[in-house]
């Protein structure tokens, strides 16, 4: 399939820029049309019986922690060996090394590589990187649009419209050519990135049920389940096959700010503005454990991609590292005080660096193992703007680039010296 040709007739919801080179998931994974998500009456009936999700779980090959880590390494070694010249000239040469072999020096510093000024017409509130090829990333904005960008060149690949309010959360499937978005308009939408010849457009599904804005979402890494949460303080679990809401997880007393999903237990972890983190047993639809160590609202939480650990940050500048599945507190660091609101956290597994982005534009890089502060910096608003907040961030899959989404309507790309 020549994707460069069929993308020219992309659905009416997407406006394309001239440069198009998006991955074909059907080719990459050898997926046939019959393999795509379709309603399953058997599954729908099963999730509503007394056993809840037992039907799903009994069909999943459970893997131990070592196998999960091996899979993450295999994904990394499939990434391109030669980095794009536009990025490489600003960074140390990586030559033909495998991405998994790259271990930057501990004394290296992150510096600004590129400013995508005017990337959106409003605050840039969410971002995520393509988990399959590491070639593109997606951003959502308070201007209600979603944009897809080439990671190497930062060229705009597509603009997706359909939400009527700001886009606060995004998730890209690693199993299907689907993008999910959550908005302040209380809707979750599913976009088919390869449905280019459909007269109905690329928006293929709506998930209705939330009564407030949707601020967080996550896809289960193995099961066809989507988790969403937001202002209504509950987490809704959606069956992607039957398109139905299969359960509601209640317990938080304020906005849901982050959701993380993993293969092992606890399969769902959430953070909230009520200053708690909850670990959920989704087989029983109950809270397995509530962590109450934070004294202020938690705006961000990040899970280590290769370890059973996670980190959370609150509005007083405190960072806490946790061990899973038991929720033991491993470390506390950060700088507590006023005006130290942490909006976003990201973990770079290639060198165990934790990035913390603040509401006042400050940026901090920590050694994830020791909690030592490695670098403290600040972003500079683009000309004509006084907004400096960093709202969202993510490392690419190689760990060589950091993407920050900011209040000055820009996107910034950072790399190590």
Swiss-Prot record:
WD repeats lie at residues 119-159, 162-201, 209-248, 251-290, 293-334, 337-376, 385-417. Keywords: Cytoplasm, mRNA processing, mRNA splicing, Nucleus, Repeat, Spliceosome, WD repeat. GO terms for biological process: mRNA cis splicing, via spliceosome. InterPro entries: G-protein_beta_WD-40_rep, Prp46/PLRG1-like, WD40/YVTN_repeat-like_dom_sf, WD40_repeat_CS, WD40_repeat_dom_sf, WD40_rpt. Its main location: cytoplasm. Coiled coil: none annotated. The keyword Calcium does not apply. It is found in: Cytoplasm; Nucleus. PROSITE patterns: WD_REPEATS_1, WD_REPEATS_2, WD_REPEATS_REGION. One of its GO terms (cellular component) is Prp19 complex. The keyword Cytoplasm applies. It holds the Pfam family WD40. Associated with the spliceosome. Belongs to the WD repeat PRL1/PRL2 family. Involved in pre-mRNA splicing and required for cell cycle progression at G2/M. This is Pre-mRNA-splicing factor PRP46. It comes from Debaryomyces hansenii (strain ATCC 36239 / CBS 767 / BCRC 21394 / JCM 1990 / NBRC 0083 / IGC 2968). The lineage of its organism: Eukaryota, Fungi, Dikarya, Ascomycota, Saccharomycotina. The gene is PRP46.
